[in-house]
Amino acid sequence: MEPGTIPSPVSAPVAAPVTPSAVAAPVQVVSPAAVAPAPAAPIAVTPVAPPPTLASVQPATVTIPAPAPIAAASVAPVASVAPPVVAAPTPPAASPVSTPPVAVAQIPVAVSAPVAPPVAATPTPVAPIPVAAPVIATPPVAASAPTPAAVTPVVSPVIATPPVVPANTTVPVAAPVAAVPAAVPVVAPVLAPAVAPAVAPVVAETPAPPPVAEIPVATIPECVAPLIPEVSVVATKPLAAAEPVVVAPPATETPVVAPAAASPHVSVAPAVETAVVAPVSASTEPPVAAATLTTAPETPALAPVVAESQVAANTVVATPPTPAPEPETIAPPVVAETPEVASVAVAETTPPVVPPVAAESIPAPVVATTPVPATLAVTDPDVTASAVPELPPVIAPSPVPSAVAETPVDLAPPVLPPVAAEPVPAVVAEETPETPAPASAPVTIAALDIPEVAPVIAAPSDAPAEAPSAAAPIVSTPPTTASVPETTAPPAAVPTEPIDVSVLSEAAIETPVAPPVEVTTEVAVADVAPPEAAADLIIEPVEPPAPIPDLLEQTTSVPAVEAAESTSSPIPETSLPPPNEAVASPEVAVAPITAPEPIPEPEPSLATPTEPIPVEAPVVIQEAVDAVEVPVTETSTSIPETTVEYPVAEKVLDPAITEAPVTTQEPDVANINDGAPATEITTPAVEIVTAAAEVSDTAIPLIDPPVPQEIAVAEIPETETKPAEVIVEQSTIPIEAPVPEVSKYAEPVISEAPAAEVPITAGDNPDNTSVGISEVVPTIAEKAVEEVPTSEIPEQSSSPSDSVPVAKITPLLRDLQTTDVSLLAIAATLDAIGEKLKDQKARNQQVMDRLCEIEKILGPPKSN
């Protein structure tokens, strides 16, 4: 029967949407019952009235599927719980559900006393039905809205719940808990929608639901397990709340599980509000809201809750009070989620059950459906975790106070409508457990935590037996995870921004990099100092160019600094948008700031600028080069000025001889041609030069003798008057031997000889005189060439050495008409050089001819 009923319950839970309306009425009843402490009178009144309604609703919803299973399980527990309750639920089966609400209504009236006895009785019998009791543990879930799935199971736990009620009875709050069972009215509303069985189940139904609950319990435990962790926290609040939520039903039912699962969800989820009703109506509301939610995610967890509920039932009674405050806090998030959960279950089951749910779906159908959607809900919550967190926060604030005082009345209706209205929030079903963790953490955290909470729920489902002990750790864990998600959540949101920020920061970084490049360009400007080096060579221009590069550096540095500032300013701006991650961007900004600082430093140092120039900004360097070129051109302009100053020194020479430079150059040419007719000798001289290079290699050792010969020639002029002939002989003798050799160096010697002579003359006479001499010499040479060659050439053929020097010297003395020894010596040297040149040229020709012959025979020289 039970299995069969379970399938139908599936459709019934779907009808959960109908439950919302039923919830409204029962909620009012529940609020009086659960809140009995304050509105005890209204509770008494309304409970009586609602019981009929509950009865009517319950039979419609729960009666059909749940009755048989409930009767089976309930018979045993009912005996222990209370004969009236057992009798009523068992016979009605389908309708008994409605009657149990009536009995329940009575119980609410005598909530404290009647409930406590049933609880005491039930706990013992319930032990055998623990499986259903887990469902009761689900009622805690139902508090969250998941329990509804375990509605009937919760009923059995409700029997266990009475034990909790004693604890509640002991404490004023406990009494409210007992009232919560009395809240059966509330349950009735819930039951009417989906958990009608739960109402009676708590007191009367408990016997009947156990069978049905057992089946769903197995499924529900999963949800319960997740809830259990949260319950640990929430459980405390239920007691403190003294709300129907505390409704020991959950706590008592699975004292541990119920408090854990129910408390968190009861106080946490609207379930507490409606869940409070749910606990009482654990079977009722759970079917509608909690059942759908709990069923989907938490059905597996319920099983563990069952065992726990039995074991920790007593403990739970004590425990709930401690967590009492937390459930309230948690309740807000749970409240929001509970409706959503209900809606989830509704969404899942609604299509098939929509019409049937109105009557039957709540009790057994809910139980049956709960297992199936439970898993689905579990999955969904993870997906829609984001949406869930938002809803819980909104509902959370009101549900807590309302749950405490009027939770059944106000919250239940709103919760149920959302359940029916918003089937989509099904995901919230999972979230309901998660919301407890959010209670400890901010709502946003809840959103993040929700997915994580779901995993926690899965773990409880894995170890249902361990759920009690694991529940507490899990509870702590969800908050921890919640806190972690909190931290994670902000980063998650921020990361997207930080990503953009990082991009911006990167852009900013790049921009600062560009400024450094400009800085390097500034360094390049400093490097441009090379123009300064040129200026140093120039001496005076150095000063003007130095300021010019400074200006360039300043100008470049100013734009660079501005650019760096502009870049750095945008960098902080980009960094500012993300407060958290702005740090990275500020750091980047700092880097560019430091870059401009080095800029001034490289200016003085040239080495550093040279390095950065090639490194980062060749383009900038080019620009800097252009800028530098400008000062360079300026320095060049100054250079001509300096040259103008040097010309001043030349001007000193100009007054003496304006044409001197030209003439001096001419004398050089003349010196080369002095020996013989310039026109004729020039061409051979070129040839001789080329040949001389070759001959020089062979005649290197012979070069030395000509040097002393030359020295002798220089000495000869000193003894001009004495033996000119002797000099001629000496000169002729060595000339003959080394002529070929000397001819090789004849030209270099020629250039050297005048140089040596010039310093001598310079020592004796001023430069002007030397210039004049250079001028005079050519004339003398010309004269000698004209006179001597024509007349003496034949003499040379006979005895060139003897006649030529004498003839030359005599005319020089005649022409000079001076007694200046220096001039005479110079004339003599020039004459001797001319003779040597003539002889050497002739001999060079001979040597060249010989060399050509040798080359023809031996080939080109290879001694190089």
Swiss-Prot record:
Region described as Leucine-zipper: spans on this chain: 816-858
- In the UniProt record, the signal sequence range is none
Q: What is its main location?
A: cytoplasm
Q: Where in the cell is it found?
A: Cytoplasm
Q: Name one GO cellular component term.
A: cytoplasm
**What is the annotated tissue distribution of the protein whose record heads this document?**
Soma and axons of photoreceptor cells of compound eyes and ocelli.
An example molecular function term from Gene Ontology annotations: calcium ion binding
Does the keyword field hold Calcium? Answer: yes
Keyword annotations for this protein?
Calcium, Cytoplasm, Sensory transduction, Vision
Biological processes, Gene Ontology terms:
rhabdomere development; sequestering of calcium ion; visual perception
Identify the domain of life: Eukaryota
The protein's assembly and partners: Homodimer.
User: What biological function has been recorded for the protein in this entry?
Assistant: Plays important roles in both rhabdomere development and in photoreceptor cell survival. Might function as a calcium-sequestering 'sponge' to regulate the amount of free cytoplasmic calcium. It binds 0.3 mole of Ca(2+) per mole of protein.
Protein name as annotated: Calphotin
